[in-house]
Every structure is written in structure tokens, then in C-alpha cells.
Amino acid sequence: MIDERDKIILEILSKDARTPFTEIAKKLGISETAVRKRVKALEEKGIIEGYTIRINPKKLGYSLVTITGVDTRPEKLFEVAEKLKEFEFVRELYLSSGDHMIMAVIWARDGEDLADIISNKIGKIDGVTKVCPAIILEKLK
């Protein structure tokens, strides 16, 4: 298990993975070396799997972001998922329970682009039975 300090380290790094260890150490009242050791231990335990960046899709010309549910014939689920992984416009992809079998985060330039993605790309994959996009209006957290 992890202790309260580790939880704080994870919270800080999840907001900004580039936060200097010296800054984290000051917030926790411990040495930079202690922070470094804790982060290394969190990495070795597989709690920290990697470091990434957040991209603003609008700054790259993608005015629409959707969370899109995709349903398939059961025997085609994994084939469809593999095909979806190949598309650049699919930014994240999840197998899920609930309303849809697959959930995809999709970036589209505009409504026309989204319609093309849904009808001519995802909708034409063998085994896809339903595509249900929900346009993200505002990211809250």
C-alpha cells in the first residue's frame, strides 16, 4: 500500500508531471532524495506507469471531441477494437460494460468530419452494429 505522502506525490504529478522534486519536497517537508526514492518505488510497483502530456485539440484544429459508443456483433468485438486502434482520430479506446461494448474518444475537425468518421470509417467496419457519438461541450475536470 501507499501512505499519505505517496498519495500527495501522485496528486501533484498527475496535475503536472514536470513538477520538480525540489518543489514536491518543500510541500511535503521532506528531502528531494526522499521524494526521488518514493517516485522510483511507485514506478517499480507499477503505480506510476509513465508520464504524459495533455494536448488541447482545439489548438490543433479539432473543434469537436466526442466520447463515442460502438457496438459490435459479439464475435467481432476484438477485431473491431483492433481496427479502431489504427485510426488517428481515435485518441483513446476502451472496452466497456454498460450501454456500449467499446468507448472511443474521437477528435474531429468539424461536424462534416465527424459525420464522415462515423458513417464512412467506423460505420463501415465489419461487425459494427451501432455508433453513438456524444459531443463533449466542456471539460470540467
From Swiss-Prot:
SMART domains: HTH_ASNC (SM00344)
PANTHER family: HTH-TYPE TRANSCRIPTIONAL REGULATOR PTR2, TRANSCRIPTIONAL REGULATOR, ASNC FAMILY
Keyword presence, Ligase: no
PROSITE patterns given in the database record: HTH_ASNC_1, HTH_ASNC_2
Protein's name according to its UniProt entry: HTH-type transcriptional regulator LrpA
Gene coding for it: lrpA
Lineage: Archaea, Methanobacteriati, Methanobacteriota, Thermococci, Thermococcales
Keyword Repressor: yes
InterPro entries linked to this entry: ArsR-like_HTH, AsnC-type_HTH_dom, Dimeric_a/b-barrel, HTH-LrpA_regulator, HTH-Siroheme_Decarb, Tscrpt_reg_AsnC-like, Tscrpt_reg_AsnC/Lrp_C, Tscrpt_reg_HTH_AsnC-type_CS
